[in-house]
Design a protein with these regions (language model features):
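Auxiliary alpha/beta "docking" domains used to position bulky ligands
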Residues: 2-211
Length: 211
């Protein structure tokens, strides 16, 4: 039931005309959804720094991870052309307490992420692409979606040196972090804050730039 999920129809000055996307997000299974002015999507070069320090396994190894995505500067210029964004969240059954090296059981971050949060990661990806399509069909043909974390649609990404294209281009999307979006500040601006290292369920967060 939509009434049992958290919906933030408007935040800031996001136009009422776009509330159909919030309703659609909840209908499609989002735990929470909110509209916000695109100017409240926070971009910070330090987010990309955290892709490299400490280095993420996806860095330079995945098509939708840095440095293979658009630069932070290019994304910031592109973001300036948008006025409305939709932020969505998919809640996990697990909390966000940190795991130390021993708690990881010798597994890589990618393996652990797929094992612990794979269902939510894939659910968020499907949700974002469906909402992007809904916005497109409604006439907002510049709609563009972003997910969270490393893409796990394939067991492993294509060999970048081969020049082969993405195997699932209609489903794969870059993470918000990959283009420099500060997910925590942006979620807070949307009225859907995320708490780090807490006993609250992990909230996988995605974004659709609408118009």
């Amino acid at each position: 039931m939509v009434s049992r999920r958290k919906a933030q129809a408007l935040h800031g000055e996001a136009p009422v005309a776009f509330t159909f996307l919030v309703e659609k997000a909840l209908e499609l299974g989002a735990s929470a959804a909110a509209l916000l002015p695109a100017e409240q999507v926070v971009v910070d070069e330090r987010v990309r720094l955290k892709c490299a320090v400490p280095v993420c396994p996806g860095y330079a190894n995945y098509l939708h991870c840095p440095p293979n995505t658009m630069s932070v500067q290019e994304f910031r210029r592109t973001l300036d052309r948008y006025s409305v964004a939709l932020l969505v969240q998919v809640e996990s059954a697990r909390n966000s307490l940190d795991l130390d090296a021993e708690g990881m059981g010798g597994k890589s971050v990618v393996e652990l992420e797929a094992e612990l949060h794979g269902d939510e990661n894939r659910a968020l990806g499907k949700l974002v692409t469906k909402l992007e399509a809904e916005a497109f069909k409604a006439g907002y043909y510049y709609a563009a979606g972003f997910t969270g974390g490393i893409c796990i649609l394939c067991p492993e990404c294509v060999d970048l040196a081969s020049g082969d294209p993405c195997r699932r281009p209609l489903e794969a999307r870059p993470a918000m972090e990959a283009v420099g979006i500060d997910v925590f500040k942006t979620a807070a601006n949307a009225g859907l804050p995320i708490k780090l290292s807490s006993d609250e369920p992990v909230r996988w967060t995605g974004l659709v730039l609408v118009e």
